[in-house]
Structures are given as C-alpha cells and as structure tokens.
Curated annotation (Swiss-Prot):
The keyword Secreted applies. Coiled coil: none annotated. The cysteine framework is III (CC-C-C-CC). Classified in the M-2 branch, since 2 residues stand between the fourth and the fifth cysteine residues. Disulfide bonds join C53-C65, C54-C61, C58-C64. Its main location: secreted. Residues 21-50 form a propeptide. Keywords: Cleavage on pair of basic residues, Disulfide bond, Hydroxylation, Neurotoxin, Secreted, Signal, Toxin. It is found in: Secreted. The modification 4-hydroxyproline is found at P63. GO terms for cellular component: extracellular region. This is Conotoxin VnMMSK-01. Residues 1-20 form the signal peptide. Expressed by the venom duct.
Length: 68
C-alpha cells in the first residue's frame, strides 16, 4: 500500500512540480506607490505630524494611524 502511495506521489510531483505554484514575489504589490522613489507620506494632506501617521484609511495613505 505504501509503495502505491509513493508511486502516486512521484507521478503527481512530476506532473505538477512545486515550481508551478506561484510564489509571493510573483504577486502584484498591494500599494504600488510605495515602490516609487518619490513617495513621501509627510506631504500627504491626511498626514498627522504629531502622531506621525495618516488619519485616513490605509488604502489612501501609509503609514495609517491605529484606530482610536
């Protein structure tokens, strides 16, 4: 029984190698603006200089402030 499972596992790995699974590096970035060189959250209109974070949602400005 174990040898049959081994043969089945070998066949499955040959047909569908682990390299065919997409890795995290292949996924698009959630926030492409963070990848640019000129991204400065301090210049955002929602940036709170006292708390050093943005008062808006994280999809709008990074780093976003923790909820109160």
């Amino acid at each position: 029984m174990m040898s049959k499972l081994g043969v089945l596992l070998t066949i499955c790995l040959l047909l569908f190698p682990l390299t065919a699974v997409p890795m995290d590096g292949d996924q698009p970035a959630d926030l492409p603006a963070l990848r640019t060189q000129d991204f400065e959250p301090e210049r955002s209109p929602w940036f709170d200089p006292v708390r050093r974070c943005c008062s808006q949602d994280c999809s709008v400005c990074i780093p976003c402030c923790p909820p109160p």
